[in-house]
């Protein structure tokens, strides 16, 4: 029976499969099998025993139901796996889990789950990057009003908006490469990290296990891999979520009825409200913003998991059972929703232009001030004069440039040609070059495989 929305509502089947019980059990069995193979290579156990253990360390032989049955009796999840695997291996079962402590298996298996999950996240980030890159190129010259403090500021372009997000997604992709080096690690170090239970060949055993599984050995551990590693992982997931939250929030705001410059896609048969038939609510981007709040909240317990008693206690375990699958599945949902939204983003060019001129050239106050300073008026004096003229234009509902034309002090410095040149479309500075620089950088990273 599904209870949590990640079981049935959020995330892809691909990501949910990573964290479902059967796959988690399989990863534990994979680690046990790799340990047996390492022992056999070093002559610690018979090769035939390693072969049998490896062959039967899968969920076709070791049933989840049997593991749960044993755990209900002995109240120890990993020992339940060990007993269930030993049962199906017959006389070879005595070599299962040789030298290991529970978290040798758990933490190494977690690294395998995280590796699978991060591969999905990376794929989605790269697909999102491609979508944003095309949007930045397509709208490099789409001039719109920039807003600061929710108020009209000066012109920018939609190319700038998309390139800003593109650059941030690229940083996440680069962060992910660095993160893998620290997160995709396992351990075979025993109860307190000294590896005493593995004897003289402890390092060789660990090296063989990690090479077999495609992981790196942690440099030092106590009973567990230190949870600063997981905290960094959780912060990365939350940081990606914050970028998606930022993008979704901007689209939601730009879809407001009074603005309506862009809109998330709306299906032909889609219903916006149960009582208001006309509604086109931004439910996809609202969902992204909502799920981000859960991702943010999961960072705190990850930080609290780092300080544990002595060589470890168990307070981290129950937390990680919740926050790891939940965070990966929810981020997976957010990434896939944002890909869909951006692919189908609707633009309303007439509204973009209307909003650009909505303030009757008040947004030209900055270039007007700079033009006066260029013509010989002191910069501070020009600022105060334009401020007064802008406030007058605002109060009287008049065009700023018309007010300027009737001001003797301003017109001592300005010509009609100066005023004619003050058009929003002309005041975007180096926007095109900035967007091109971002796109060029991203394309270079793509060529490098980053």
Swiss-Prot record:
Molecular functions per Gene Ontology: (S)-2-(5-amino-1-(5-phospho-D-ribosyl)imidazole-4-carboxamido) succinate lyase (fumarate-forming) activity; N6-(1,2-dicarboxyethyl)AMP AMP-lyase (fumarate-forming) activity
Keywords (A to Z) from UniProt: Lyase, Purine biosynthesis
Binding residues for N(6)-(1,2-dicarboxyethyl)-AMP: 9-10, 75-77, 101-102, 223, 274, 279-281, 318-322
EC number(s) stated in the UniProt entry for this protein: 4.3.2.2
Pathway: Purine metabolism; AMP biosynthesis via de novo pathway; AMP from IMP: step 2/2; Purine metabolism; IMP biosynthesis via de novo pathway; 5-amino-1-(5-phospho-D-ribosyl)imidazole-4-carboxamide from 5-amino-1-(5-phospho-D-ribosyl)imidazole-4-carboxylate: step 2/2
InterPro entries cross-referenced by the UniProt entry: AdenyloSucc_lyase_C (IPR019468), Fumarase/histidase_N (IPR024083), Fumarate_lyase_CS (IPR020557), Fumarate_lyase_fam (IPR000362), Fumarate_lyase_N (IPR022761), L-Aspartase-like (IPR008948), Pur_lyase (IPR004769)
Keyword Lyase set for record: yes
Enzyme class: lyase
Gene Ontology biological-process annotations: 'de novo' AMP biosynthetic process; 'de novo' IMP biosynthetic process
GO CC terms, sorted: cytosol
Active site: 149 (proton donor/acceptor), 273 (proton donor/acceptor)
Catalytic activity: N(6)-(1,2-dicarboxyethyl)-AMP = fumarate + AMP; (2S)-2-[5-amino-1-(5-phospho-beta-D-ribosyl)imidazole-4-carboxamido]succinate = 5-amino-1-(5-phospho-beta-D-ribosyl)imidazole-4-carboxamide + fumarate
Domain of life: Archaea
Summary of the function given for this chain in its UniProt record: Catalyzes two reactions in de novo purine nucleotide biosynthesis. Catalyzes the breakdown of 5-aminoimidazole- (N-succinylocarboxamide) ribotide (SAICAR or 2-[5-amino-1-(5-phospho-beta-D-ribosyl)imidazole-4-carboxamido]succinate) to 5-aminoimidazole-4-carboxamide ribotide (AICAR or 5-amino-1-(5-phospho-beta-D-ribosyl)imidazole-4-carboxamide) and fumarate, and of adenylosuccinate (ADS or N(6)-(1,2-dicarboxyethyl)-AMP) to adenosine monophosphate (AMP) and fumarate.
Family recorded in the similarity comment: Belongs to the lyase 1 family. Adenylosuccinate lyase subfamily.
Self-association and partners: Homotetramer. Residues from neighboring subunits contribute catalytic and substrate-binding residues to each active site.
Protein name per its UniProtKB record: Adenylosuccinate lyase
Organism: Pyrococcus abyssi (strain GE5 / Orsay)
Taxonomic lineage: Archaea, Methanobacteriati, Methanobacteriota, Thermococci, Thermococcales
Gene that encodes it: purB
């Amino acid at each position: 029976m599904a209870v949590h929305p990640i079981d049935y509502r959020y995330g892809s089947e691909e990501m949910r499969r990573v964290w479902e019980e059967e796959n988690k059990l399989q990863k534990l069995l994979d680690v046990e099998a790799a340990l047996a193979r390492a022992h056999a290579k070093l002559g610690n156990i018979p090769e035939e025993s390693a072969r049998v253990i490896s062959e039967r360390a899968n969920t076709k032989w070791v049933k989840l139901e049997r593991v749960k049955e044993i755990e209900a009796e002995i109240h120890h999840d990993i020992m339940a796996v060990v007993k269930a695997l030993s049962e199906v291996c017959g006389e070879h079962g005595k070599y299962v889990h040789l030298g290991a402590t529970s978290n040798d298996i758990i933490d190494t298996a977690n690294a395998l789950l995280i590796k699978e999950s991060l591969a999905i996240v990376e794929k989605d980030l790269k697909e999102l990057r491609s979508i944003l890159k095309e949007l930045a190129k397509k709208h490099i010259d789409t001039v719109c009003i920039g807003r600061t403090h929710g108020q009209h500021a000066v012109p920018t372009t939609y190319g700038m908006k998309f390139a800003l997000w593109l650059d941030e997604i690229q940083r996440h992709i680069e962060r992910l490469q660095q993160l893998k080096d620290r997160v995709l690690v396992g351990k075979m170090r025993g109860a307190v990290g000294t590896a005493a239970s593995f004897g003289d060949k402890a390092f060789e055993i660990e090296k063989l296990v990690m090479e077999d599984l495609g992981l790196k050995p942690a440099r030092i551990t106590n009973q567990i891999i230190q949870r600063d590693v997981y905290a960094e992982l959780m912060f990365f997931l939350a940081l990606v979520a914050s970028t998606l939250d930022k993008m979704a929030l901007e689209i939601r705001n730009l879809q407001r009825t009074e603005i309506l410059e862009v809109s998330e896609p709306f299906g032909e048969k889609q219903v916006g409200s149960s009582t208001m038939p006309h509604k086109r609510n931004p439910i996809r981007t609202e969902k992204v913003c909502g799920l981000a709040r859960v991702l943010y909240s999961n960072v705190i317990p990850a930080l609290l998991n780092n300080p544990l008693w002595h060589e470890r206690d168990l307070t981290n375990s129950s937390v990680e059972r919740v926050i790891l699958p939940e965070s990966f599945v929810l981020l997976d949902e957010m990434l896939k929703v944002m890909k869909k939204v951006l692919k189908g983003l609707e633009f309303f060019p007439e509204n973009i232009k209307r909003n650009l001129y909505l303030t009757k050239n008040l947004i030209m106050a900055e270039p007007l001030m700079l033009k006066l300073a260029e013509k010989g008026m002191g910069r501070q004096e020009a600022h105060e004069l334009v401020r007064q003229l802008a406030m007058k234009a605002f109060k009287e509902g008049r065009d700023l440039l018309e007010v300027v034309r009737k001001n003797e002090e301003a017109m001592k410095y300005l010509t009609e040609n100066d005023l004619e040149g003050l058009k929003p479309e002309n005041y975007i500075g180096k926007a095109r070059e900035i967007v091109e620089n971002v796109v060029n950088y991203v394309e270079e990273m793509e060529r490098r495989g980053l």
